Design a protein with these regions (language model features):
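Acyl-donor-binding surface of acyltransferase catalytic domains
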Residues: 1-15, 54, 92
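Polyanionic, low-complexity segments and short acidic motifs
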Residues: 2, 19-23, 159
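Acyl-donor binding region in acyl/amide transferases
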Residues: 90-166
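Core nucleotidyl-transferase/polymerase catalytic module
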Residues: 63-66, 88, 104
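Short amphipathic alpha-helix that is part of the acyltransferase structural core
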Residues: 14-82
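Carboxylate/His-rich catalytic cores and anion/metal-binding grooves
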Residues: 79-89, 96
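A broad, low-specificity signal marking well-ordered, structured residues that form hydrophobic/aromatic
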Residues: 25, 85, 117
Length: 166
């Protein structure tokens, strides 16, 4: 398995090596409270428009935010956020503390596993939902997830708007 992972790492084309003309986005990690509040406002806007949810103070915030790493994709020229997700690494015995554990009974199935990455609150601005922005966001997560966090498993919750509730 390690051999396959090393082969994958060698053949992976980093999104940072793309031609500048192909990339209209800038990827980064939230590293201060001002940026955290900016992504919380972005999340609130996306979720309120899509699901009709209202947020106190216009911020989608919870206790998980302070223990997570926050990935942001911005439009290169304006600096506006176009896509976002948050990450938290758990060991199996900690999985009951995850956001997913609030929504699903994950403890019996995941508590024995090492290095579980929870991804959540992912959202993309409606003008950028063609797939390119989300692809760029995920591609930029790969180095962190594989090399820094060394995640072995990935889990998370997703909210999807369905037309006519089908």
């Amino acid at each position: 398995m390690l051999e396959k992972l090393n082969h994958y790492r060698q053949t992976l084309t980093s999104p940072l090596r793309q031609k500048p003309s192909q990339n209209q986005f800038r990827f980064g990690w939230v590293d201060n409270l001002k940026e955290l509040q900016e992504v919380q406002r972005f999340r609130a806007n996306q979720f309120s428009h899509q699901f009709g949810i209202s947020f106190e103070d216009g911020l989608d915030q919870d206790l998980y935010d302070f223990g997570c790493e926050h990935a942001v994709l911005r439009e290169k020229w304006t600096g506006e956020i176009v896509a976002y997700t948050r990450l938290k690494l758990f060991q199996g015995h900690e999985i009951g503390q995850s956001y997913s554990a609030k929504e699903f009974d994950v403890v019996p199935n995941f508590s024995h596993l090492p290095s579980i990455l929870e991804i959540g609150r992912t959202c993309v601005h409606p003008q950028f939902r063609s797939g390119k922005a989300l692809s760029m966001l995920w591609l930029n997560l790969v180095p962190k997830v594989l090399w820094s966090m060394r995640a072995k498993y990935v889990m998370g919750c997703v909210s999807i708007h369905l037309e006519d509730n089908l």
